[in-house]
Each structure stands twice: as C-alpha cells, then as structure tokens.
Amino acid sequence: MRPPTMQYPEPAQSDRPAAAAARVGIRTPAEQEAMRLAGRLTAEVLDMIGPHVVAGASTDELDRLCHDWIVDRQQAVPAPLGYRGYPRSICTSVNHVVCHGIPGDKRLKQGDIVNVDVTVIKDGFHGDSSRMFCVGKVPPHVQRLVDVTYQALWRGIRVVRPGARLGDIGAAIQSFVEGNHYSVVREYCGHGIGRGFHEDPQVLHYGTAGTGMALEAGMTFTIEPMVNAGRREVRLLPDGWTVVTRDHSLSAQWEHTVLVTDAGCEVLTLGAGERPPA
C-alpha cells in the first residue's frame, strides 16, 4: 500500500511499478567519474562544517557556511536551494526532527543531536550525504542511537553488489535496527541519483530479503536510514518540509551515495578519515 503523500524526496512506496526498472540509469565510466567528483565535494562540505556544529551556533549560520563553501570554494551548486521551493542550501534536523529541517535562527545547545544533509551539483551530477553531529557530550542512550543508525547504514551498504536485490538492503537495515529496539521510518527512503536529484530506484530501509529490483554494476543511489528511538510514525509540519517523530522521540540519520561496481560497491561520499564500523 502507498504511504501518505509527502514531499522531498518522493514518499517511499513498496509497490513501485516494474516499469521503474527500465528508468534506472547505468552510469558510463565518464559519468562514474563525474559522480565521484560530486560525492567527494559533498563529503568535503560535511568535513568542513563539523567543527562549526557547536553550542550557540544557529542552523542558519551552518547553512550560510555550507552555501558559501559550495558556491565560492567549490564552484558548484547547492542542490536543495530552490528545489520544489525549498528555501535553504542544506537541511538541518535537530533532535526529534527526522529529516528536511529548514535552517533558521534556532541556536544549538549542549546535548543536541543534529543531522546535516548536503547535496552538491558539480558539472551536472549530484552527490548526496548526511551526517549526525553531537553538540558537546550527549548521554549514553543518545550516543547509542546515533551509533546504531550509523552501523545500520553500513549494514545496508555491505550487501550492495551486482545481483543483490533492493529488498536485501532494507532487510539488513530493518533487522539490525529493530534488533537494537529502535524503529525504522518508512515514509522516506533512499533514491537513485545522478543527473537528477531524485531518480529511480527507491531504496527502502525495510523489507524482505530476495525481493525487489536486482542491482547492476553502474547504478548509483543513496542509502539513508532514519531511525527513531521511539515509534516509527512521523508527521509533516505545516511548513511542508520538516518531518518530526509523532511521539517526540529522538531520531537519527546517516546517508551515503554508493556506486554498484563489478566487485561490490564504492562509497562515493566517504569523509576524510572515515572508516566503516567493524
């Protein structure tokens, strides 16, 4: 069944038409190189902004720093700005905000957790990634949510290879998250990415192994699980963008863009010094 209609990206659908498979792009070697560049620049923005995610900083200030870096330093384009009317260059989702939080004058405080979501367009291709940042020291139960979500992302990444199915990704993430007594948001999902910001296929973060589209070398898509400390239900605020947990529980998200290769997959948005969890 189809979940409620929401925006940015398209709502997750478990019943996508089979015809969607015909629309999934297989990147040429030249396009793969362009995707690597866009991914590298996206990771660079997140590396840059990390030290600025501190108590007293406003999310609008973070947006301005990222915008200027992308436009002035990278000679690139912040994809979210103006996308379907979105008013800022990044998304900043604090505490119980699940995704698509709009930067504003809200100032961060000690103990907050913040997801910063960055998408860069360079030479016509997109890179998309998000990271969690903790403002100062957070309680152990909060750190655990952040860590489990990161591990869940990598559980999904590790099953990506030619011949694997989209359902394998969702099943790996869902079983790990629920095994750690958290819940997976179902209304939003990963997506194909390339010349378009949001392309086919949709990459659900829940599902059944062995189902869904078979992966092929040359596909590029995001994996971006949103994990709630409480129940999985979310609601959309009147601004039309900000998604929050219905029960006001904390939520965390991590995202990478991946390329399916003959040998498995390549993560295009790795941060400086980032090492996959054991």
Language-model features, listed with the residues they occupy:
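Active-site neighborhoods and metal-handling regions in enzymes and metal-associated proteins
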Residues: M1-A278
